[in-house]
């Protein structure tokens, strides 16, 4: 009787230990799987941060076309891709309609659907590729009858037509650049734009490229747009400054660039132009840099 009980106890203990080991192995396998996924994403040697890597500008590419090329993009060493605006354009069929949006929301446009953008972001994650979306926030389409309903009120617009004197900073930030200029100083406008960024983030977007950034004022110009839309979003930001935020005033231009760099990185267009010129002329100038030599930290520049 005692031996029978002992054998039974031994069998029960063996079964228990086997189950315990199996459970442990399952736990280990489950814990290893995410590491393997991360390892697979890092097989291409891509940068963890957008600022540190190369961005492929997929200008006017459809979302599904980008998704189909992700492996090739990763193998080519691009750590991020940049799409054209996800906002709904005032028309279709030509790239520039996307830069005349009807509002601040993701909708169906020439690039694809909201679901297709989300699918692109999810697939890009598996390769370790970040997704940057171009955002137009300086203006909307000229036909106000079709723009976002809650922005139709005149108080949300600067209503300053006429040409722009680019040595006049106020005109740069308040006058139309062919489309109606949004009142970036208005707190409601700022929140509408920020909510759009959070919508993009919810779809898996990692970064924002700001179109016409130099046409949007700074805190020193009584405008809290930039701190409002960038803080707390968890997104990387860079913008379009082009040559200078103001012409014919180097001291003011450098001060403004320093202020922009508190909130966003920006393109060093002068540097890129100098590089192109060096290739064309087969000559390298003694100083090929631009913004970096004017006091802007190199980790805030995009080339």
What spans do the regions from the language model cover?
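Active-site-proximal helices and loops of the catalytic beta/alpha 8
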Residues: 41-52, 68-71, 85, 92-99, ...
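N-terminal carbohydrate-binding/catalytic regions of secreted carbohydrate-active enzymes
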Residues: 54-110, 130, 184
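N-terminal secretory signal peptides that target proteins for export/translocation
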Residues: 1-9
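Aromatic- and acidic-residue-enriched carbohydrate-binding clefts of CAZyme catalytic domains
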Residues: 40, 49-53, 89-122, 150-183
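Glycine-rich, aromatic-flanked loop segments that form ligand/cofactor-binding clefts
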Residues: 76-86, 116-142, 146-163
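Sec-dependent signal peptide cleavage junction
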Residues: 23-42
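The substrate-binding groove and active-site-proximal loops of carbohydrate-active enzymes
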Residues: 52-61, 99-112, 175-190, 206-219, ...
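Sec-dependent signal peptide hydrophobic core
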Residues: 12-20
